């Protein structure tokens, strides 16, 4: 499966990923398990990573494959190096649900698209479980196929609720390779938020061979 395949990525790619670990913008020294150099006990700072994935009907199998590859890299990246990082998996159609790792990567689900539902659930979980003493990070993958009031409402919620409580937020928008205009209304709304913030980054991807470079660019 995808996780097993990712585990067998070339040694060069894995070594490069690990070499960049200490330059990753969203995990600085306070997120790392303290390495005692002076024999004085120090607290272990805690970090949580929210993984949000669109699994609606507009996300065809190719797009879902791209999203799963992105999150598999993220999963391996964090679990290989940071045992103290909690991972929260949220998938959404027109409603959102928290699921385990296996369901997130493997279960099939489809429906309409309400991006806001995933952001709202992420914030609810953050407030209930990770309100104090946690460094919060999030990564979202979607084709941006949201309509009506959802893009603007989602961007407003991101700006007003999630970003103030988040150290680093990334958005990956997926499109078919032959798509001429890769940017959705959701992208346009998010872009305005990202430009005004210092902790939000956005990228596009259309092919499998773009996922690793995009991931590396986001987390270098």
Locations of regions flagged by a protein language model:
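Short acidic/His/Gly/Ser-rich catalytic and metal-binding motifs that mark active-site loops
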Residues: 96-101
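DG-centered beta-turn motif at the end of beta-strands
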Residues: 51-56, 135-150, 174
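…and closely analogous acidic/polar surface helices at protein-protein or active-site interfaces
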Residues: 46-47, 57-89
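Phosphate/oxyanion-binding active-site loops and adjacent basic polyanion-contact surfaces
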Residues: 26-28, 63-67, 111-119, 150, ...
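Acidic, polar low-complexity linker/tail segments
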Residues: 1-50, 59-61, 83
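Von Willebrand factor
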Residues: 103-136
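Surface-exposed acidic, glycine-flexible loop patches that form ligand/cofactor-binding
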Residues: 40-42, 80-81, 127-133, 160
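Von Willebrand factor type A / integrin I
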Residues: 157-220
């Amino acid at each position: 499966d995808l996780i097993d395949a990712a585990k067998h990525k070339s040694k060069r790619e894995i070594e490069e990923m690990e070499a960049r670990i200490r330059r990753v913008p969203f995990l600085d020294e306070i997120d790392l398990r303290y390495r005692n150099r002076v024999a004085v006990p120090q607290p272990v700072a805690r970090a949580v990573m929210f993984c949000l994935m669109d699994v609606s009907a507009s996300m065809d199998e190719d797009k879902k494959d791209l999203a799963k590859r992105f999150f598999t890299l993220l999963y391996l990246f964090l679990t290989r190096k940071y045992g103290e990082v909690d991972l929260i998996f949220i998938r959404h159609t027109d409603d959102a649900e928290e699921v385990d790792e296996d369901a997130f990567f493997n279960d099939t689900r489809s429906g309409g698209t309400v991006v806001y539902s995933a952001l709202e659930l992420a914030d609810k979980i953050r407030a209930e479980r990770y309100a104090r003493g946690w460094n919060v990070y999030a990564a979202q993958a979607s084709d941006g196929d949201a309509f009506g009031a959802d893009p603007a409402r989602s961007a407003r919620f991101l700006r007003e609720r999630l970003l103030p409580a988040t150290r680093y937020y990334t958005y990956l928008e997926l499109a078919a390779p032959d798509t001429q205009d890769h940017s959705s209304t959701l992208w346009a709304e998010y872009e305005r938020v990202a430009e005004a913030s210092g902790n939000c980054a956005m990228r596009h991807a259309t092919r499998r061979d773009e996922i690793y470079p995009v991931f590396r660019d986001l987390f270098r």
